[in-house]
Amino acid sequence: MAKFEAHLKCSFCGKSQEQVRKLIAGPGVYICDECIDLCNEILDEELIDNQTKTREANNPSNKNHTAITSTSKPAPTLATIPKPIDIKDFLDKQVVGQEVAKKILSVAVYNHYKRLAWQGDGNQETDLTATRLHKSNILLIGPTGSGKTLLAQTLAELLDVPFAVADATTLTEAGYVGEDVENILLRLLQKADMDIELAQRGIIYIDEIDKIARKSENPSITRDVSGEGVQQALLKMLEGTVANVPPQGGRKHPYHDCIQIDTSQILFICGGAFVGLEDIVQKRLGKNSIGFMPTDSRGQNHLNRDLDNNQMINNLEPDDLIRYGLIPEFIGRMPVTAVLEPLNSEALEAILKEPRDAVIKQFRTLMSMDNVKLEFDEGAVTAIAQEAFRRKTGARALRGIVEELMVDLMYKLPSEKNVSDFTVTKKMVDEMIIGGKVLKLPSNEKIDHPESA
């Protein structure tokens, strides 16, 4: 037996067991430690080659970095940044009301991009004694449908910068099922056509930020992976850091290269309804409970409660947000707070008619493609606005109501050749609201349009 063992050798290189450190036996074969090391080197080389090919195929930011940066839009200069008054004038064309919020946003956005222009001139790099300008992110507080997302979107349109919207309710702390916070940056990068420099000057709007408030005022012994954990994960990104973003989204992988994005120049705007925040404010102020007021069939008296609640929110202090569930560090990184007012029926009427992309203007354009002139009389506009106000979902309700109203009309009109114009009246809107009836073409097809009620 000893004689047999003396002749054992590696089945691959032929070296005997005396010539190597280790000889591992298998079913009828042997392999030495030197051959194992050689196999590992071959596998590592193939793995690196495959990673390089995959990265070049799937990561355009690395493959075309030189081409992308050479065609990137120039950084803003003080001469090209619109002034706060001009910014507000542009917002007025798209957003009805919210005068105070628009003024706050105009100043905050102007200062942010003025800071970028100042840094782009090299002031902060050449003069070590120069004052450092820090970023001021924005927190928007307002009921649903009051225009929070539209304000942020309109600002990005004016400034011609990439704009991405993220939903805070989908985010979770790293290591748990859900989206990592870095995926927010990937959306912005995709909006910028993978242009890193352009993305770093963009705007990110994080909606439903109130939904990541921690569940209780006191820290819990259990993990709050979609509440306080997400707030902690967002801190560095909001303040300004170099984040590693997986180019394909999802979780980070140790074998995948990440794109590095500097968030110090990205403007973050967070928005939420913060339902119940007014109760926290009124408790601090020692006010009597507002309570729900009696309403008529149209829900008109709800407006008084909304206005009182809005007055409460205007007395907001950071401590109220902490009691609501935001951590102090998170609030400190959102120094600019703008409160949006609830929309009354008059504001909803204006939203129906006045903005560039008003709902009525959109439907007129759609009908004009079928050579039909569509009109809404004043009574119809008022009735639609009052119904939207009753539904308590803000401006979002307007389009849904008009869609319900027009569905049958828009189904038949494209096939009608002898209808040149159509007027929507208050009677038609009331019939739809009360009886669920939709607009129909006149029974006499020779009539161009129905008489106003």
Curated annotation (Swiss-Prot):
Stretches with biased composition (Polar residues): 57-74
Binding of ATP, residues: 143-150
A Gene Ontology cellular-component term: HslUV protease complex
PROSITE patterns named in the record: CLPX_ZB
GO terms under biological process: cell division; proteolysis involved in protein catabolic process
GO molecular function, one term: ATP binding
Residue ranges, annotated region (Disordered): 53-77
Domain ClpX-type ZB residues, every copy: 1-51
Residue numbers binding Zn(2+): 10, 13, 32, 35
Keywords: ATP-binding, Chaperone, Metal-binding, Nucleotide-binding, Zinc
Source taxon at top rank: Bacteria
Keyword tRNA-binding: no
NCBIfam families attached to this UniProt entry: clpX, PRK05342.1
Assembly and oligomerization: Component of the ClpX-ClpP complex. Forms a hexameric ring that, in the presence of ATP, binds to fourteen ClpP subunits assembled into a disk-like structure with a central cavity, resembling the structure of eukaryotic proteasomes.
Family: Belongs to the ClpX chaperone family.
Function: ATP-dependent specificity component of the Clp protease. It directs the protease to specific substrates. Can perform chaperone functions in the absence of ClpP.
Name this protein carries in UniProt: ATP-dependent Clp protease ATP-binding subunit ClpX
